Amino acid sequence: MPMFRIRLPKPAALIAAGGIGACIATVAVPSAYAAAPAPADSRLGVTASLDRLPSIGERSTLTVNITAETDVKRAGLSLQLPPALRIVDRNPSLAAPTTDPFGQRTSRTLTLTPGTRTIELEVKAVATGPAQIQADISDIDRPDPRRAGHASVELTIGKAKGSTAKGMSVTKADATPVSGPTTPGRPVRPGAAAPAAPSTPPQAAAPGKRYAPVCVSGTLRNRFQSSEGGSWNSKASRDLPVSNANVTLWGRATAGGGTQKLAAGLTGNGDGTFKLCYTPSTSVTSQVWAEFQTQAGTMWSVVDGYNRRYSTTSNALSNVSGNKSLGTVYANSGQSRAWHAFDTLNKLWWDRGSTSTCWTSNQRDGRCTPITVQWYPGSTDGTYWTNRDDKVHLADSDPDSGHTTVHEAGHSLMGKLYNGWWPYVTNCSPHYINRTSSTTCGWTEGFADAVAFHTFKDTVMTWGNGSSMNLANDRGTRGMDWGDACEARVGTALVDLWSQVDGGWTKSNTMMSRERQSTFREYFLTDRPAYGLDSGPKARNILYGHTIQY
């Protein structure tokens, strides 16, 4: 496995590029989703830039350059502005912008010839805070990450002239208000100045006196955009609870007192609810608030470019006595992709096919290794996993696709099943999901595809730009190569074996945790029968339907 260096985020510039000429880290497990170098006749690229950093009320020119190295009959251009920016002078070639909780979106279908096309439009800053402009270009008729480009411009809009800065910091942030995605005000959070003392000062507990327990409840939710159910120019909007997130209840017993950890727990699986209780030391607790982190116990987490977990802090409750509710707390809008990736891993966790309380059966209870995802706004460090640090690296818009997140996590799962060992994989960079690569690439990538299919109960692959491809196949499927060197054939054959022969994938995963396979042939012919998994006529017929014959 080659070594590589994790690229840490740098302050964002005014210009961002994606697609053509993108630089990729050398990794051992290149993904079907990675923006790997593609043949010259299949490249699309896009850049986006602002001519100035606008403060609130000021305008700036957004310039988008689309580059093609081949003819593309229908290229889809999608532009998304955050709620803090508004289109004020639209280029007439673009569709009328639509507005939703995520900001404004406009698009256009283009016919491209080799060269560069430029589109300009005027935008205005209408609110302060972190902001991200995104541009996507893709081949509508041939969805594939190698025929697509993504660009991102990040800035933090200030109120006073000249106060807007490059880049955006959202690792630690306040919750987004229930009524909308942004707010000029900031809720009280740890370290903030203490409010005025309550009109009735709290009474300190007399020696030996105990006050009744206080419970604080609420629900954590996340608003995000999803490629599942969306399209290249309109991803689906989702508003869902966040499951199994670490939550800590903090407080100050008195107005001038120090911050204390009162209680900790997890949000509820499926509903995002929490109820944390503590025994106060005074009759009234001056302040109480909740902090949520993108970590589930110690089993999985999402971190930024510096390996820090994202955290969202609720508004503070004042003068607390008796049971209270924080109501619905929304993850900070700038962190929505981190929380989406986090909650996507929860789907995989509850159907991971393990007989232990770890990700895989070969790990002992209480001695589990986690799955870690690294993502940050504007990231170009993706899309891949490495077994050197057992970390998934997602690029900027990757978390919008749950399939992408789980595909990469599927590599981590295989690495755990193999206890850190990895096959010697050849002819896998680049590789195409529906084309022949090698039998080792077809096996490792096909397994990761199958993990995504199994988790989402489908055979549709989605990408972060909203495009998708249905990979359901048989011997008559056109546009897909035959055999076990094609990952789509391997992935769909695996899920059919699990569902139609094995009664789920737990037995297969247990077998994989005891034996190592470099190819699908080895998995099917050698190890399945050795562990009592069917490789007879019914199983072979499934493979035959997916053009795999042994």
Swiss-Prot record:
Q: What class of enzyme is it?
A: hydrolase
Taxonomically, the superkingdom here is: Bacteria
Q: What is its main location?
A: secreted
Please give the start and end residues of each transmembrane region: none
What's any GO biological process attached to this entry? proteolysis
Q: Which residues form the signal peptide?
A: 1-34
Q: Where in the cell is it found?
A: Secreted
Q: Which UniProt keywords apply?
A: Hydrolase, Metal-binding, Metalloprotease, Protease, Secreted, Signal, Zinc, Zymogen
Q: Where is the composition biased (Low complexity)?
A: 180-208
Q: Describe cofactor binding as the record notes it.
A: Binds 1 zinc ion.
Q: What GO CC annotations are associated with the protein?
A: extracellular region
Catalysed reaction equations from the record: Preferential cleavage of bonds with hydrophobic residues in P1'
MF terms (GO), sorted A to Z: metal ion binding; metallopeptidase activity
Cofactors that this protein relies on: Zn(2+)
Residues of the region (Disordered) are 160-209
User: For this protein, what is the EC number?
Assistant: 3.4.24.31
Binding site residues for Zn(2+):
407, 411, 445
Residues of the active site are 408
Residues of the propeptide region, as annotated, are 35-205
Does Membrane count among this protein's keywords? no
Q: Which family does it belong to?
A: Belongs to the peptidase M5 family.
What this protein is called in its record is: Mycolysin
What is the source species?
Answer: Streptomyces cacaoi
Source lineage: Bacteria, Bacillati, Actinomycetota, Actinomycetes, Kitasatosporales
